Amino acid sequence: MKRIAAFTLYCLLIFPNIAQADNVIEFDDLLYAPDDSLRSKQLSGVEVMGEREWRENGIINCIPTKSERRLSNSPASLIKTMHLTYLKEKDGAIVNLMGEVVPVFINGKRASQIDLETFWPKEVKRVQYLEHPADPRYEGASAVVNFIMPEYKVGGVTRVNLFQRFPNNGYYTAASKLVRNNWTYGLMVRGNYERDHLTSQTGKTEYRDFFYKNQKYETLTRTENRHGYSRENGVQTAWNARYVTDKTTISHDLSFGWNENPGSGSLSQDVWSDNLFDASHATERHTAKSLSPQIYGLYYFKFSDKWFLSNSWKYAYAENTTSAFSQIGKNTPILNGTNEKVNSLKIVVMPSFIPSKKWFFQLYTTASLDWFSTCYTGSANLRQKQARQDVTASFKMGWYPNDDFGLTLEPGMAASFWKIGQEKQHTVIPTMNASASWSPSKKVYLRGRLGLYMRPASPSESNPVLLQNSELMWSLGNPNLKNLTSWDTYIYSSYLVTKWLSLSYGLGYVKTKNEIITTYRPASFEQGGLVKELVNPLHSEDRVMANISIDGSFFNDNLSVSISPEWSFVHVQGARYDKFHHVTFSGSIDYKLKDVEMGISYKGPYKDIDESGMRKTWRQGAWGASITYGNGNLYLSFQAENIFSKRNKRWEQFTSPYYSSRFDFREKGRAFTVNLTYTFGYGKKVDRSIDISGPSDAKTSVLHGE
């Protein structure tokens, strides 16, 4: 920690000595209005934060440079190249200072999968960041990033993206859309695959106080050296038709998804204590397929300047099949299979009332209904039916007396109902979210948030089917699980020290009750072995997180440096009482030279403790390097991941009364990626704000094994 503090102090002292002249932005890039015309209003009510950033009507605006647009091929990569204080790129997503993923909007319309696949950074005129926006087009989101792009009447845009990692996975996407007057039509096709034959693990497992074949075992140890392999293929398509006027939006999507695991598994070399199994190896194999057509409708109506209505619905059907094989030596194999059909329906209704610029009111209601019918074969021969309904309702009130201060309050309720066979359960709990924002000066921004979060048990977690996964292990869900609840508190701030240096700070506290954790207990005398099941612990878990981000831009904004130390503390009082501290560090350096950008990055090691203190994990840090070329239409990026480690290392340790394990994993480490994107437009004008949803992940109630 002392080294991090010293390094931070050094950065603060040395940066002023190497700062260079201000960046020059072309006149054509300045202050575009939403319709892409130049602003004619005066700067009254506009708070300038930096040379290309300003706050107006509670919205933070930023203009990307020409170089930043060219060296990007997605919303997240554009945010990364812009090096903003209040938004960051993380694992291909955009996150705010609290670490929350921020949804992407384009010209005030939510960007779905096809929007992202046809996103053209070259056309971005302005980036806006809004928190708790009153505009009902933002669907009641707590924070959004909105990209202002030109809207045209007639034309189209086509984008092709090829991503390949060596070794050994890739995805390939082609998307296009056509605009004619008020109508927009879109089409997307995407394929992906993955092959991993490089994962291995070594370690030891202890089973305690169990029966097996009429004999009681106090302790049994298995030492293993396992080599695993995994494979996956997938295809997704989406079609869209949308009609838009100033007061109405009507959009319908049809999508289709197919995924398969053609065969994955592992082969291990084992040593058993007491020579329980006359075998030196074990084999596991499994396959899976999922097929899911989906249809989605979105509607927006503006009745007046004060009354609005947004609603949507989505229906999805899925067929999921799985098979599993487990064998120790020449023992009788353990076989399992499932054939599942799923029907899902979700409805969202959000009326809004905006009486003035200072006040807004939103009623947000959702209803989700899922029906599962699953046929189990193998260790469990039965057909199970499960029905679930989740209903939420909240009333959001916002008060913004001026651009520098705002308050929101959102009380609500969440109810869950489910029926599994003849067993019924339900829960109803209150929810609450509150936030406050304050900008004491043009360089300082403060925000705080308090929320009561609820998550019901998933269909697979509440599944009461008992499955035998291996010779000594069974799995069992729990239909009596309580809803996970947590109090989340965050305070964060951003500070623009100078035009070339900015700081951001974050502090969070989360208290979790009824966490859903994994435990083990002895199986019955007839079954033998152990049963892995899910329970709610008696005690809570407390987490405290703090982070600092230092961002600097030098040499006419061509050199960018980012430094981010993080600290976390976990206090668990569940099955195992424990306290845990962890400090890590990440950073990056990027240099732009006309249409080329070169960069190096470092992501520090990671430690965590969860499962009520029973599970501890560690992962090593990694260095990366990249070089990117872009000219507006063509984007080409080469990256080297984990450049100093041929294999990525991590370990996992689990400790409980009846089952304990410790494994060291060696996974895919050093890898090289190529990302090629080509985008072109045609016709007079192009509208890139189409809302098309690709197929989301298919739901399943199937109980997960080991």
Predicted features along the sequence, with ranges:
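Bacterial Sec-dependent N-terminal signal peptides
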Residues: 1-24, 43, 248-250, 307, ...
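Short acidic/polar hinge/loop motifs at secondary-structure boundaries
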Residues: 75, 83, 108-134, 176
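Short, acidic, small-residue-rich periplasmic hinge/interaction motif at the N-terminus
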Residues: 23-68, 89-92, 131, 136, ...
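Extracytoplasmic beta-strand/coil segments of soluble accessory domains associated
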Residues: 76-109
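Short, charged/polar, Gly/Pro-enriched secondary-structure boundary elements
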Residues: 43, 54-56, 102-105, 151-157
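Primarily recognizes Gram-negative and organellar outer-membrane beta-barrels
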Residues: 131-133, 139-142, 149-172, 180-497, ...
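N-terminal periplasmic accessory domains that precede
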Residues: 45-49, 72-78, 93-95, 114, ...
